[in-house]
Amino acid sequence: MSVRHFLSFMDYSPEELIGLIRRGSELKDLRNRGVLYEPLKSRVLGMVFEKASTRTRLSFEAGMIQLGGQAIFLSPRDTQLGRGEPIGDSARVMSRMLDGVMIRTFAHATLTEFAAHSKVPVINGLSDDLHPCQLLADMQTFHEHRGSIQGKTVAWIGDGNNMCNSYIEAALKFDFQLRVACPEGYEPKAEFVALAGDRLRVVRDPREAVAGAHLVSTDVWASMGQEDEAAARIALFRPYQVNAALLDGAADDVLFMHCLPAHRGEEISEELLDDPRSVAWDQAENRLHAQKALLELLIEHAHYA
């Protein structure tokens, strides 16, 4: 059986993705009831971080421990990846010592190159193009609060970044309509727009995007690596702040999500995370449970003599 990776939602069928978020909720219930479940005993996940993170490291490391395994944190200072060793060579060596590798990186090509030479599953913990693990958590959170997202309308407000690209893939797999409100020149990548077809509508007015929407989501205006553009972006994106008044134009049962960390007073108003329509804290927690479902699926379970 060939090894499976998780680099993009497009690698999986809708049924598989729905199964993952349902399994995430089941594992969450086991955890909340104090049930010990350790199918990955003695398994080791390598976590390669070229980009810093709080939620990604915590959720994967805690997830592996809760499933009975272990996780090893590797920064660019800890590996030859940061000092010029060919990515394929690193993949060949690491996959002989580990049972899975999670990579949080800049260039998406780093992931595809690593996966092409790895004998163990490779998971996209984030790239400049996509953030599929976050979308698993988002879809699980919506399902827990509102049921199926099929046929619903989702609004993305702000930069057409990696999160926006992943929402496009989610729209195709989970069968919902996506509206993106962004300034001209900050649309999602053309390849994702083309992929979306009639599932996507790009508009300039955030009020148009949220009208009747069942889910509204946003992200920071300047992502990691864009610090030099931050001041200009803040000025340009100011009309795209998500606040209570904007949410009032959405569906009565709208949910608000933010992948965090949030810049209160910028992409969201100061109080929005505390609004009863916000499920950002559940969304953050579900990174743990959704990724445990993913680890359980991808990494070979322990065998007992």
Swiss-Prot record:
Its pathway, per UniProt, is: Amino-acid biosynthesis; L-arginine biosynthesis; L-arginine from L-ornithine and carbamoyl phosphate: step 1/3
Q: Describe the family membership recorded for this protein in Swiss-Prot or TrEMBL.
A: Belongs to the aspartate/ornithine carbamoyltransferase superfamily. OTCase family.
What EC number(s) does its UniProt record assign? Answer: 2.1.3.3
Q: Which BP terms in the Gene Ontology apply to this protein?
A: arginine biosynthetic process via ornithine; citrulline biosynthetic process; L-arginine biosynthetic process
Activity dependence on pH, as recorded = Optimum pH is between 8.5 and 9.
Tell me what reaction this enzyme catalyses.
carbamoyl phosphate + L-ornithine = L-citrulline + phosphate + H(+)
Signal sequence range? none
Quote the Pfam families the UniProt record gives.
OTCace, OTCace_N
| Keyword entries, A-Z | Amino-acid biosynthesis, Arginine biosynthesis, Cytoplasm, Transferase
The gene behind this protein is: argF
> Which NCBIfam families did the record assign?
orni_carb_tr, PRK00779.1
| UniProt-listed PANTHER family | ORNITHINE CARBAMOYLTRANSFERASE, MITOCHONDRIAL, ORNITHINE TRANSCARBAMYLASE, MITOCHONDRIAL
Query: Taxonomy-wise, where does this protein's organism fall, top ranks first?
Result: Bacteria, Pseudomonadati, Pseudomonadota, Gammaproteobacteria, Pseudomonadales
Q: What does this protein do?
A: Reversibly catalyzes the transfer of the carbamoyl group from carbamoyl phosphate (CP) to the N(epsilon) atom of ornithine (ORN) to produce L-citrulline, which is a substrate for argininosuccinate synthetase (ArgG) involved in the final step in arginine biosynthesis.
Q: Which InterPro entries match?
A: Asp/Orn_carbamoyltranf_P-bd, Asp/Orn_carbamoylTrfase, Asp/Orn_carbamoylTrfase_sf, Asp_carbamoyltransf_Asp/Orn-bd, Orn/put_carbamltrans, OTCase_ArgI
Residues that hold carbamoyl phosphate according to the record: S53, T54, R55, T56, Q80, R104, H131, P132, C133, Q134, C259, L260, R287
The protein's name: Ornithine carbamoyltransferase, anabolic
Compartment(s) = Cytoplasm
UniProt key word Amino-acid biosynthesis: yes
Q: Name one GO cellular component term.
A: cytoplasm
A GO MF term? amino acid binding
- The UniProt annotation places L-ornithine binding at N162, D219, S223, M224
Note the Gene3D superfamilies from the entry. Aspartate/ornithine carbamoyltransferase
Subunit organization:
Homotrimer.
